[in-house]
């Protein structure tokens, strides 16, 4: 069912909330008449922080205006006349409003659609059994909303009590003035004759005694009212503090944790809109109570009555100031983090947001935010409130930005779009620590006032740890530092402490999360894959994942010490696997055509009972980012064959699918899938031209093919009658009359015992590709394509 149809079925408060989303910035009539068109557009695909996306936003604005104009033109009849005028007016209005800022239209409609979906979900969940509540409306969120309702009612009650107290006090003051008037009348009695004076004096005395008795009683009542009201405020503040703790220390901290895990490839942290609505409700209720407390203080000053209320009010006033201070400083957050691997002299972006900016009217005098980079030690000093003013670790260009208020969404934020780290000052490193293990952070700070400069707040927030690099070759190791920090940092830590060791299952979870995100695949690491990785990391032969569950992995094992017998670390090897999959092999991994995480012996064990021509692809043990083909073909010389690993460089010349297509003797993808069934959809189409056909410039275009000459010879010697593409005649080149590009002596790609030695191997395929990739000499003799 369309979202707008469901939204129209909302009732009560949900309906009012939905209606409040619309106004002059986006009329509800536009939503109604263009509902289908609006819901079919890809609003979420536009990056609001990327100025280059402005073209897409402009196209959406133009499309919206055109659809409105079309809808207006189709209105006929008496009833349609007014609607035609109205829709035409809205088209002009939206064009004028968003013509210079089309991104704001996208932001506005995204905000509307998100909240409509939320309201519909909440309404549907409310009518469902308690056990089937959706994630958007958890039991905890229900409790938060119930507490807000309780706070609203309590605040209404104290407002009524305050008005009642004010009326009572005003009447008391009137009566007190009456008692003063009676005292003045006593002074005038001396002017009267004795008989009249005595008569008037008796009446005045009776009236005075009665009034003073009332005043004494009412003074006690007023004092009691004041104390009771102060006690109610104390209870309100206790509930407010508890609610604020849940929102800031639980919900907001959880959002920040999700944001950090998203840096490792976890699910997106989610919108801040719900959190902002809670923070705004907190701000509104806190401010209402603060104003009530101030009015109560004013009443006490207006009519001083000795008692404990002055001390109580001083306490609640200090408490509520602390509460609003904590709310203001804690809701100054980084909505979009800067990159955690930060290269100098490279543009980067970030967004900070104040969740209570709209409710506290901060946007009336927009504050400026400044970004600076500080070291780990400087961050520690900052949190200890030590003086770190002007103590920075580098220079950031374009590091100041004024916060902007977006009326449609009610957000106050600063978008840093063109920052660049000009230089970095590194600290002395400890022991074996490398530059890619040194952590920095971006400090965002600002100052703003609320309540007409009544309260002034200095706010600061730190980004997630960043590792600064100066060259792309450092990216791999810097990413390892970020991954470890994001995955294993503990709550409430001192910047930026992380455990030196973690359990293997914890690392498995982090690796799987990163793997799926980098490769952009739902096919993550299986139990068998994790066993292989554990064997590699711990240099173990156990095939049971449970055997590794209690084992710890140190940071040094992860990315400081090389693997046994290798010149690279565990992380560097794993990152190379992700890199080659992401750039060239993603569809094949998703198809399940790459087994990947098996060693040479395991590959042979898997192939031993398979028919000749069965092959599998596995990640190379010897070369970072390499993938090799292992296949079975029982010849006189050997049974298993292993091709020299391909890397990203090879696949940028010729794809894996085309390379496999060239090797006709590879028939089945392990375990038993026909090769062409798996890979044919990825083959590069071959033009239907005669091989001898000449191009316009007189040259013949060569073709690159994957060949394994030694295997051709071995398979022929074994009695194979197949005709291979690899056996096509090689081109000849002068000065040798018949230079054989594929010599018949034993080839270094495949060694005689079936083991591949990287150091002693020549990559024939690469040599051929490089040769064919050069400008053609006129002495090349073309041959027909086989």
From Swiss-Prot:
Domain SH2 as annotated: residue spans: 589-686
SMART domains in alphabetical order: SH2 (SM00252), STAT_int (SM00964)
GO molecular function, one term: protein homodimerization activity
One GO term describing the cellular component: cytosol
Record key words, sorted: Activator, Cytoplasm, DNA-binding, Nucleus, Phosphoprotein, SH2 domain, Transcription, Transcription regulation
Keyword flag Cytoplasm: yes
Modified residues (Phosphoserine): 128
Gene Ontology biological-process entries: activated T cell proliferation; acute-phase response; B cell differentiation; cell population proliferation; cell surface receptor signaling pathway via JAK-STAT; cellular response to epidermal growth factor stimulus; cellular response to growth factor stimulus; cellular response to hormone stimulus
One Pfam family of this chain: STAT_linker
Domain of life: Eukaryota
Localization, UniProt: Cytoplasm; Nucleus
Cited InterPro entries: p53-like_TF_DNA-bd_sf, SH2, SH2_dom_sf, STAT, STAT5_CCD, STAT5a/5b_DBD, STAT5b_SH2, STAT_linker
Presence of keyword Zinc: no
PTM section of the record: Tyrosine phosphorylated in response to signaling via activated KIT, resulting in translocation to the nucleus. Tyrosine phosphorylated in response to signaling via activated FLT3; wild-type FLT3 results in much weaker phosphorylation than constitutively activated mutant FLT3. Alternatively, can be phosphorylated by JAK2. Phosphorylation at Tyr-699 by PTK6 or HCK leads to an increase of its transcriptional activity.
Record PTM Phosphotyrosine, positions in chain: 90, 682, 699
PANTHER family with a match to the protein in the record: SIGNAL TRANSDUCER AND ACTIVATOR OF TRANSCRIPTION
Summary of the function given for this chain in its UniProt record: Carries out a dual function: signal transduction and activation of transcription. Mediates cellular responses to the cytokine KITLG/SCF and other growth factors. Binds to the GAS element and activates PRL-induced transcription. Positively regulates hematopoietic/erythroid differentiation.
Homology family: Belongs to the transcription factor STAT family.
Quaternary structure, from the entry: Upon activation, forms a homodimer or a heterodimer with a related family member. Binds NR3C1. Interacts with NCOA1. Interacts with NMI. Interacts with SOCS7. Interacts (via SH2 domain) with INSR. Interacts with CPEB3; this inhibits STAT5B-mediated transcriptional activation.
Name by which UniProt lists this protein: Signal transducer and activator of transcription 5B
């Amino acid at each position: 069912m369309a979202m707008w149809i469901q939204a129209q079925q909302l009732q009560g408060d949900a309906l009012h909330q939905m209606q409040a989303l619309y106004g002059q910035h986006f009329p509800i009539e536009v939503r109604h008449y263009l509902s289908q068109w609006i819901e079919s557009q890809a609003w979420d695909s536009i990056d609001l922080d990327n100025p280059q996306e402005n073209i897409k936003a402009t196209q959406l604005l133009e499309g919206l205006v055109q659809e409105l104009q079309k809808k207006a033109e189709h209105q006929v009849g008496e009833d349609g006349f007014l609607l035609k005028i109205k829709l035409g007016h809205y088209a002009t209005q939206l064009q004028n409003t968003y013509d210079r800022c089309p991104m704001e239209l996208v932001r506005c409609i995204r905000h509307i659609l998100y909240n409509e979906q939320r309201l519909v979900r909440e309404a549907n969940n409310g009518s469902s059994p308690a056990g089937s509540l959706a994630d958007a409306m958890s039991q905890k969120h229900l409790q938060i909303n119930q507490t807000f309702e309780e706070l609203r009612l309590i605040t209404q009650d104290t407002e009524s009590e305050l008005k009642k107290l004010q009326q009572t006090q005003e009447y008391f003051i009137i009566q007190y003035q009456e008692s003063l008037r009676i005292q003045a009348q006593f002074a005038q009695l001396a002017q009267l004759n004795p008989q009249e004076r005595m008569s008037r004096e008796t009446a005045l005395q009776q009236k005075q005694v009665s009034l003073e008795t009332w005043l004494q009683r009412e003074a006690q009542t007023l004092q009691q009212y004041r104390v009771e009201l102060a006690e109610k405020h104390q209870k309100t503040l206790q509930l407010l503090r508890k609610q604020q703790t849940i929102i800031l220390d639980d919900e907001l901290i959880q959002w920040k944790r999700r944001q950090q895990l998203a840096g490792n490839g976890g699910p997106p942290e989610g919108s801040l809109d719900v959190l902002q609505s809670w923070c705004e409700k907190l701000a509104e209720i806190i401010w209402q109570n603060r104003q009530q407390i101030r009015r109560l203080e004013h009443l006490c000053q207006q009519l001083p009555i000795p008692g404990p209320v002055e001390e109580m009010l001083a306490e609640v006033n200090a408490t509520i100031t602390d509460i609003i201070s904590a709310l203001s400083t804690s809701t100054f957050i980084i909505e979009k983090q800067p990159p955690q691997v930060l290269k100098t002299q490279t543009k980067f972006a970030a967004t900070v947001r104040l969740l209570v900016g709209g409710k506290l009217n901060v946007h009336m005098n927009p504050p400026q935010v400044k970004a600076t980079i500080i070291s780990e030690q400087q961050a520690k000093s900052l949190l200890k409130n030590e003086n770190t003013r002007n103590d920075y670790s580098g220079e950031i260009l374009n590091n100041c930005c004024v916060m902007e208020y977006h009326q449609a969404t009610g957000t106050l934020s600063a978008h840093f779009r063109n920052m660049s780290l000009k230089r970095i000052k590194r600290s002395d490193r400890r022991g074996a620590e490398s530059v890619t293990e040194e952590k920095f952070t971006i400090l965002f700070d600002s100052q703003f006032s609320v309540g007409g400069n009544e309260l002034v707040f200095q706010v600061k927030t730190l980004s997630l740890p960043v590792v600064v690099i100066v060259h792309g070759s450092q990216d791999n190791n810097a990413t390892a530092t970020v991954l470890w920090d994001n995955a294993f940092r503990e709550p409430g830590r001192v910047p930026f402490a992380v455990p030196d060791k973690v359990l293997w299952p914890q690392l498995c979870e982090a690796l799987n999360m990163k793997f799926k995100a980098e490769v952009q695949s739902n096919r993550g690491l299986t139990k068998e894959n994790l066993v292989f990785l554990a064997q590699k990391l711990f240099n173990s032969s156990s095939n049971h994942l449970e055997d590794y569950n209690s084992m710890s992995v140190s940071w040094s094992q992860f990315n400081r010490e090389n693997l046994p017998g290798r010149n690279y670390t565990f992380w560097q090897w794993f990152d190379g696997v992700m890199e080659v999959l992401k750039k060239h092999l993603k569809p094949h991994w998703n198809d399940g055509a790459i087994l990947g995480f098996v060693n040479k012996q395991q590959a042979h064990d898997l192939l031993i009972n398979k028919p000749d021509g069965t092959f599998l692809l596995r990640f190379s043990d010897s070369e970072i980012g390499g993938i090799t083909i292992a296949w079975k073909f029982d010849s006189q010389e050997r049974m298993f064959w292993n091709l020299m690993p391909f890397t990203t460089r090879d696949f940028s010349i010729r794809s894996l699918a085309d390379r496999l297509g060239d090797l006709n003797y590879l028939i089945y993808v392990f375990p038993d899938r026909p090769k062409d069934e798996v890979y044919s959809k990825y083959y590069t189409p071959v033009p239907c031209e005669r091989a001898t056909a000449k191009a316009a410039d007189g040259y013949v275009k060569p073709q690159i093919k994957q060949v394994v000459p030694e295997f051709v010879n071995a398979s022929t010697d074994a009695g194979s009658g197949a005709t291979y593409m690899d056996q096509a005649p090689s081109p000849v080149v002068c000065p040798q009359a018949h230079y054989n590009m594929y010599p018949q002596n034993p080839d270094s790609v495949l060694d005689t015992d079936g083991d591949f030695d990287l150091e002693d191997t020549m990559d024939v395929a690469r040599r051929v590709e490089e040769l064919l990739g050069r400008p053609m000499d006129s002495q090349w003799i073309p041959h027909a394509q086989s």
